[in-house]
Amino acid sequence: MTDKRNNLIWIDLEMTGLSPENDRIIEIATIVTDAELNVLAEGPVLAVHQSDALLDGMDEWNTTHHNNSGLVARVKASTVNDAAAESQTIAFLEQYVEAGMSPMCGNSICQDRRFLANYMPKLEAFFHYRNLDVSTLKELARRWKPDILPGFSKENKHLALDDIRESIAELVYYREHFIDA
């Protein structure tokens, strides 16, 4: 078993929109890797129930993508609320990661952290205050080494678990082609 203090928590949320004050979490997934980005475990993938009124209020982009992916139907059928999703996710993470040790890992992860702070504060507090944001490397590569960008493409399914897998693969790509680590 790897050292729980060095394992990394990868998280992705799907939301009804981009405003943590008005929108809500509709899906959460996590993956734990070791420090070398080897997957140790995949956590629960949870559709979080929200009201029909909230789902009907989504903008066109979210309505189209979340309906096409089947997520809206899963959210409507779900009996999991924010608190249950939070506790199930923490119970999974505690098996692999020491609380307060892992940065929050993912793509544009600040947005996920904002939603967690509002709706799943215990889970947000489980992370270290630092972020490991793959989108930072993408922005730096775009400016400093744009020739490597075509070498990695994403499917952008906008399903939490698939998005995490792509984020990990993207970081592996940047480690090899940009950071040279």
UniProtKB/Swiss-Prot annotation:
Q: Which family does it belong to?
A: Belongs to the oligoribonuclease family.
The active site annotation covers Y129
What is the name attached to this protein's record?
A: Oligoribonuclease
Instruction: Report keywords, A-Z.
Output: Cytoplasm, Exonuclease, Hydrolase, Nuclease
Gene3D superfamilies noted in UniProt: Ribonuclease H-like superfamily/Ribonuclease H
What does the record give as EC number? 3.1.15.-
**Tell me, what is an example of a GO biological process annotation in this record?**
DNA metabolic process
Q: Which SMART domains match?
A: EXOIII (SM00479)
Q: Which domain of life is it from?
A: Bacteria
Q: Where in the cell is it found?
A: Cytoplasm
Matching entries from InterPro entries are given as: Exonuclease_RNaseT/DNA_pol3 (IPR013520), Oligoribonuclease (IPR022894), RNaseH-like_sf (IPR012337), RNaseH_sf (IPR036397)
Domain Exonuclease: from-to ranges? 8-171
Q: What does this protein do?
A: 3'-to-5' exoribonuclease specific for small oligoribonucleotides.
Q: Provide a GO CC annotation, any one.
A: cytoplasm
GO MF term (any one)? nucleic acid binding
Enzyme category, top tier: hydrolase
